[in-house]
Amino acid sequence: MSQSKNLLYPEKWLSRASTGVRVACELRMRIISGLIESGTILSENKLAAEFSVSRSPIREALKILASEKIIRLERMGAVVIGLTEKEIGEIYDVRLVMETFVFERLGRANVDELVTDLSKILEMMKVSIKYKDADEFSFQDVLFHETIVRSINHSYILMIWNNLKPVMESFILLSMRARLKEKYEDFERILDNHELYIKAIKTKDRDLMLKSLHQNFDDVQGKVEDLWLSQQMLAKGAEQEND
């Protein structure tokens, strides 16, 4: 796969990924960002030429995206569906239900090691913000929540998480990039929310757990606005390149 001048998905996150997964990650970002609009028909031949790969990894990528319901495979090509505000809200609904369940399980578990691991990740999030690295912050943010989910060793909860992760990760990445440029001061609130998560887990305070969950998941409109900002910035950048 050739190095494109405008890859949206961080290359360093793909060191062990197959070519098909690499293409899927990039196309997913372009679709969620709005660079590839809903209704667009994706051609295997054109994508193969753009990414300098054979059609086989393109087919793999399109199957992945179809399983995530952001494209629809048809005879004339893959039709882009995209991601609506309603669907973004539904992703956070599922996360709220899932992480509430995980928190309930943690109330009966030894959480010392988990608290230590989460504290380390939080420090990395703080460093990322200090150096204004939205990509690393997004990586650590996803890792923070994944560490919580994995801690209860529940195979079906983990399966749900893994199914949500690709779209969720792309959405978070785009949102955090926009937030870094337009609402940098808001990262302090995000860090405080994660501090609250750790405190809730450590103390096993159910009310604090619910408060931390709702503070993180209730502001879906704000997250959608961040994505909208990201789309505007990317569109502006594309216009400048074409001038």
Curated annotation (Swiss-Prot):
<dbReference type="GO" id="GO:0019521">
    <property type="term" value="P:D-gluconate metabolic process"/>
</dbReference>
<dbReference type="InterPro" id="IPR011711">
    <property type="entry name" value="GntR_C"/>
</dbReference>
<keyword id="KW-0804">Transcription</keyword>
<dbReference type="InterPro" id="IPR008920">
    <property type="entry name" value="TF_FadR/GntR_C"/>
</dbReference>
<dbReference type="GO" id="GO:0003700">
    <property type="term" value="F:DNA-binding transcription factor activity"/>
</dbReference>
<dbReference type="InterPro" id="IPR000524">
    <property type="entry name" value="Tscrpt_reg_HTH_GntR"/>
</dbReference>
<dbReference type="InterPro" id="IPR036388">
    <property type="entry name" value="WH-like_DNA-bd_sf"/>
</dbReference>
<keyword id="KW-0238">DNA-binding</keyword>
<dbReference type="Pfam" id="PF07729">
    <property type="entry name" value="FCD"/>
</dbReference>
<feature type="domain" description="HTH gntR-type">
    <location>
        <begin position="17"/>
        <end position="83"/>
    </location>
</feature>
<keyword id="KW-0678">Repressor</keyword>
<dbReference type="GO" id="GO:0003677">
    <property type="term" value="F:DNA binding"/>
</dbReference>
<comment type="function">
    <text>Transcriptional repressor of the gluconate operon (gntRKPZ), which encodes the proteins for gluconate utilization. Represses mRNA synthesis by binding to the gnt operator; the binding is suppressed by gluconate or glucono-delta-lactone.</text>
</comment>
<dbReference type="Pfam" id="PF00392">
    <property type="entry name" value="GntR"/>
</dbReference>
<protein>
    <recommendedName>
        <fullName>Gluconate operon transcriptional repressor</fullName>
    </recommendedName>
</protein>
<keyword id="KW-0805">Transcription regulation</keyword>
<keyword id="KW-0311">Gluconate utilization</keyword>
<dbReference type="InterPro" id="IPR036390">
    <property type="entry name" value="WH_DNA-bd_sf"/>
</dbReference>
<feature type="DNA-binding region" description="H-T-H motif">
    <location>
        <begin position="44"/>
        <end position="63"/>
    </location>
</feature>
